[in-house]
Amino acid sequence: VRAIDRLGLPAVRMADGPQGVRNNTKSTLYPSGIAAAATWDIDLIQQMGVSLGKDARARGVHILLGPGANIYRSPLCGRNFEYFGEDPFLAGEIASAYVKGVQSMGVMACIKHFAGNNQEWARHSVSSDIDERTLNEIYFPAFEKAVKEANVATIMTSYNLLNGVHASESKYLNQEVLRGQWGFDGFVMSDWVSCYSPVNVARWGVDLEMPYAKCQDPKLIKKLVEQGVIDERALDKKCQNIIQTIFAFEFDKREQLDKSLPANNPECDAVAHKLSQSAIVMLKNENNFLPFKKGKVVVCGPNADKIVTGGGSGFVTPLISYSVAQGMSEIDKKIKSTFVPMVADSRPVPGVVYADKALTQKGIAAEYYTNPELEGKPAHSFITDKVGIQENVFGAHNDMVNVSTRHTFYYKPAKDEMYHFTVNTNDGFRCYINDQLVMRDRWHKDSNQQGYMELEMKAGQLYKFELQHQNVGGSINAEMAFELPFVEDNSMAKTIKEAECVVVCLGHSKLSEKENSDRTFGLPRGQVEYLESILKHNQNVVVVLNGGGAIEMAPWMDKVKAILMAWYPGQQGGLAISEIITGKISPSGKLPISIETKLEDNPCSANYHE
């Protein structure tokens, strides 16, 4: 938010959260919200809040956009990992402690997303229809506790509609509940590009539209005031809410950047480590197979050698990266650990591709249109190296709504290849191979579309790929991926057979669990087959699961010795997991959610996409 020098109002800097200060730089990556909730440790969560506040002050950040306090309703929601589980009381206790910790460091917390934002599917257009009793018993308590007990400074509204009204302009939410019933005296901001009606926003809605003024455009607002459509006193109240909160935190009297605090803070890292240790839940331990204190261990799986976290605005680039493979190799001299890479391949395009049929220009031809139907000449045409959206093509402050794109490339494989071919977009898409329509979905506002097919390509044959994509509302996303199907690697069979313990790291990641799209209940494609291939050679298997919620385990859980739910455990997660496997610490995490045997056991599964 820009400064207004003539009024003595300072610039106010925000950073995404909730599990770290995402500020276009490396920062401490704490365990995700669902992991924090699994600790059931309010004092530790408040320490996390203090540490987040320190990280923010070390970077000159005034407002941390967290915590996320939406209730876990379905395992499919792509942002469950940011939230605090399904229990309203627990979520409220965790949220309140988080806010108190952050704000004790002179940083505003911003609890989000108020209210009923419990899925990413169609989040700009779906209406969460919830009766008043259910709202007050299930969906409101975490926010209410943060207001009444932690005096949270700011609140962010949700993308969805609540009972048919957009949250950013809801009189019921923003006026009657927040200010009337709960006595909230901070300010309310919108989620990014989620204001729709200038009049309703001015009368009943948010105080601050983010990330820039569209409904609150000064010229438009002035005209509406002059016409008598908007009461100027409503605008005065919004300004008062913002200014008094800024003054309450004394942002006008001090520098927010605290140079005495290191950006890479050992104290914050220690808190992240303690949280990781306290969050991991032991779901199974057959015949006390764990702890494993000495002998040969193989560590393998898609999540074994990397920091694993959810994606979207909650993604934080960590200061350090402690994987399970690294942790097991360093944890104890009595442990002889071997990392076995998973034979897999995933890439945005299948190989060297060309923008033209003559195969003279390497890259992908991208075309951007200022209408949603690919009509007329493209406003921008260029060669790029990936199928994906470049958000500043139309300018830094263009929200890229009501636009369409086309990405085209040619590929000639040198050998026969079989791929799993996936498309992931919000809103609609059409995919052509050699000018034949092979995948499509209806062009629909913010519907988070996904397509999948098996694709066999022949050596020497030229293939033309074309992905058309439309964005008519909300954030924009279009991705294409080619995945080689899982093939068992027999070269490592001897190593796996000889191991006394095999730690298989499975689950989701920023690629499959993220903002703006929902995930599957089962493991990502190929992982069950991979686990089965390990079990052929060795049954002494410990599965370490990453994810923001329940994952289907029924097909394989009886075949393995132990299961650890590690959630997204932060930058020290690999060490904490290794400490639990080897008995350096005892697993103490508790489930903040229910885990269904099958998706149909979840009450909302039958109507989730309605």
Task: Identify what each model region corresponds to.
Residues 1-418, 424-437, 443-610:
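Glycoside hydrolase catalytic-domain context in secreted enzymes
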